[in-house]
Amino acid sequence: MKLDVFAGQEISELSMIEVARAILEERGRDNDMYFSDLVNEIQNYLGKSDADIRYALPFFYTDLNTDGSFIPLGENKWGLRSWYAIDEIDEEIITLEDEEDGAPKRKKKRVNAFMDGDEDAIDYSADDPEDEDFVRESSDIEYDEEDPDDEKSEVESYDSELNEIIPEDDFEEVDLNEEDEEDEEEEE
């Protein structure tokens, strides 16, 4: 691939975001690109190794999102913001969504750029609990409404335990009024 914009410049000094902008400008408005295709084109143009691209990928994606000249078009497709008037951006995205409603969706195979064909590696996205539908399991424990008989039996058992510790015969009856009178005398 040859980009005329960079004629006379050292390819190794170009940033991935500059190359992405040039690639999208050369392809034109009707040729928006998937993110993975865009990264592959950049890698081919810059001649970078897979390891270099893997290292730079998170930074490039962040730059792509924060740079005001790029716009996500849905389904991980990207285009240039200059291709769309402000009012047209929402219409274009809605139109893409409307067109898809008629055709059945095929699931695309997920490609993990960091797996690198290593069979021993653990793919953590395969067991993501958010991907599964939530099903509430019924519990075996049933809660009854309060039963007054249960409360009485609890009180009786509590009283019997207290009687075992301190028999009822040992309790002294205290007149509450006597205590109040004693407190008043002490205060004087």
From Swiss-Prot:
The keyword Cell membrane does not apply. Residues 14-83 form the HTH HARE-type domain. GO terms for molecular function: DNA-directed RNA polymerase activity. Keywords: DNA-directed RNA polymerase, Nucleotidyltransferase, Transcription, Transferase. It comes from the Bacteria. Residues 119-188 are annotated as: Disordered. InterPro entries: Asxl_HARE-HTH (IPR007759), RNAP_delta_N_dom_sf (IPR038087), RpoE (IPR029757). GO terms for cellular component: DNA-directed RNA polymerase complex. GO terms for biological process: DNA-templated transcription; regulation of DNA-templated transcription. Pfam families: HARE-HTH. Participates in both the initiation and recycling phases of transcription. In the presence of the delta subunit, RNAP displays an increased specificity of transcription, a decreased affinity for nucleic acids, and an increased efficiency of RNA synthesis because of enhanced recycling. Belongs to the RpoE family. RNAP is composed of a core of 2 alpha, a beta and a beta' subunits. The core is associated with a delta subunit and one of several sigma factors. This is Probable DNA-directed RNA polymerase subunit delta.
